[in-house]
Curated annotation (Swiss-Prot):
Cofactors: Zn(2+); Fe(3+)
GO molecular function: imidazolonepropionase activity; iron ion binding; zinc ion binding
Entry protein name: Imidazolonepropionase
Chief location: cytoplasm
Family membership: Belongs to the metallo-dependent hydrolases superfamily. HutI family.
Keywords linked to the UniProt accession: Cytoplasm, Histidine metabolism, Hydrolase, Iron, Metal-binding, Zinc
Residues that bind N-formimidoyl-L-glutamate: 150, 325, 327
Binding site for Fe(3+): 78, 80, 248, 323
Cell location: Cytoplasm
Details of cofactor binding: Binds 1 zinc or iron ion per subunit.
UniProt pathway annotation: Amino-acid degradation; L-histidine degradation into L-glutamate; N-formimidoyl-L-glutamate from L-histidine: step 3/3
UniProt entry tagged with the keyword Cytoplasm: yes
Length: 425
């Protein structure tokens, strides 16, 4: 396969069916109406019923969608994609009955990945992460968040974030980087959590932000990780640097982290299996997105469901993500997560599809550019040979896109995908 830029998607994409809820505004385009999308210079210039296509676009090339269903490009808003090694041994431990906390106390968990990540060079981490990203892109993902948090020292956190930036450049995909230095206490700081938080706030975060490597800041607030007070210190440091925050919140217990995050205008609170009504109310008031991570729930064999009905009643937007990581969610299909969100968490199909598009984009602060189709937005959309949009959540991850337009270029046609590879539309 020769390496060259993806072919431009400029032209008229016609004979399409719009997924319900796909449009960024309230344009009255019925989902059963044959639709067209006009792309020029990598952006959507017009979208609507084919019969209403303005004559001024008639000279553009035409792409026959063949009646395909079109959705916005998918958004995976919570991943730990860059790391060294894997943790299959912990899978066996959990099958034998070990809890999340017991695995961590036995030397596994996050610290196990820290050792492997520190031992790997930047190029090695890129080589390991690239096939993972390719699998997600093959699902129709057009934007992705990648966290640090397996370095837990300045040079190693920098290494992870640099790899994340490189992945975005190599694959032509929107990557939002999140600094998760407060993911776990590194072994060399055992018993000195405040000293480590001081390092995170005073040295690591300012340095990485100055290098342009940080788009947002996250903390794991939990009894086996960092306290509310320590979390707030990190949020204050992020606030001083003008960076948005998010939180691993209420996964194993109700720490009150969601309410704290909402006070800082958090983009999202993620996991939230033990989220309280007070946390829900605070998130609603702040406009904070609830990110559901069914892969981790499934892998950990959790039985405490997130409060879906209460979130729904409160009108808190719910996103769905893979939470790809080597320990608790080795998942690489966002469509499978949509299915699991429906079957395990009882989301409706429209909620699940909004969760991997519109609401996921909002969880990354990308709501004006990603997750919905609209005039002036970058051309990020996916064509599917499906009869009904419900099939996106119905199949157990086996449904491959027909065509992916990512960042205004035809990134996939068929099942082939590679960084900067030319694929004929």
């Amino acid at each position: 396969m020769t390496t060259a830029p993806h072919p431009a998607a400029d032209g008229i994409w016609e004979h399409l069916r719009l997924m319900p809820g796909a449009l960024a505004d309230d344009s009255p385009v019925a989902t059963n109406t044959e639709a067209a999308i006009v792309v020029t210079e990598g952006r959507i210039r017009w979208i609507g019923a084919s019969a209403a296509l303005p004559a001024g676009f008639s000279a553009l090339p035409r792409f026959d969608g063949g009646g395909a269903l079109v959705t916005p490009g998918l958004v995976d808003c919570h991943t730990h994609l860059v790391y060294g090694g894997q943790r299959a041994n912990e899978f066996a431990m959990r099958l034998a009955g070990a809890s999340y906390e017991e695995v961590a106390k036995a030397g596994g968990g996050i610290v196990s990945s820290v050792r492997a990540t520190r031992a790997a060079g930047e190029d090695e981490l890129f080589a390991q992460a690239a096939p993972r990203l390719e699998q997600l892109l093959a699902d129709g993902v057009c934007a992705i968040e990648i966290k640090s948090g397996y370095g837990l020292a300045l040079e190693h956190e920098r290494k992870q974030l640099r790899v994340a930036r490189r992945l975005g450049e190599a694959y032509g995909v929107t990557v939002r980087t999140t600094f998760l230095g407060a993911h776990a206490l590194p072994p060399e700081y055992a018993g000195r959590s405040q000293d480590y938080i001081d390092l995170v706030c005073r040295e690591m975060l300012p340095a990485l932000a100055a290098e342009g490597l940080v788009d947002a800041v996250d903390v794991f607030c939990e009894r086996i990780a960092f306290s509310l007070s320590e979390t707030e210190q990190v949020f204050q440091a992020a606030q001083r640097l003008g960076l948005p925050v998010k939180l691993h919140a209420e996964q194993l217990s109700d720490m009150g982290g969601a309410a704290l995050a909402a006070r800082y205008g958090a983009l999202s609170c993620d996991h939230i299996e033990h989220l309280s009504q007070a946390g829900i109310d605070a998130m609603r008031a702040a406009g904070t997105v609830a990110v559901l991570l069914p892969g981790a729930y499934y892998t950990l064999r959790d039985t405490h469901l997130p409060p879906i009905a209460a979130l729904r009643e409160a009108g808190v937007p719910m996103a769905v993500s893979t939470d790809h990581n080597p320990g608790t969610s080795p998942a690489l299909s966002l469509l499978l997560m949509a299915n699991m969100a429906c079957t395990l968490f009882r989301l409706t199909v429209p909620e699940a599809l909004a969760g991997i598009t519109r609401h996921a984009a909002r969880a990354l602060g990308l709501q004006d550019t990603h997750g919905a189709l609209g005039v002036g937005r970058p051309a990020n959309f996916v064509l599917w040979q499906l009869n009904d949009s419900a099939e996106l959540a119905y199949w157990l991850g086996q449904q491959a896109p027909r065509t992916i337009v990512r960042q205004g270029r035809v990134a996939l046609d068929g099942l082939q995908i590679a960084p900067n590879a030319r694929i004929t539309p």
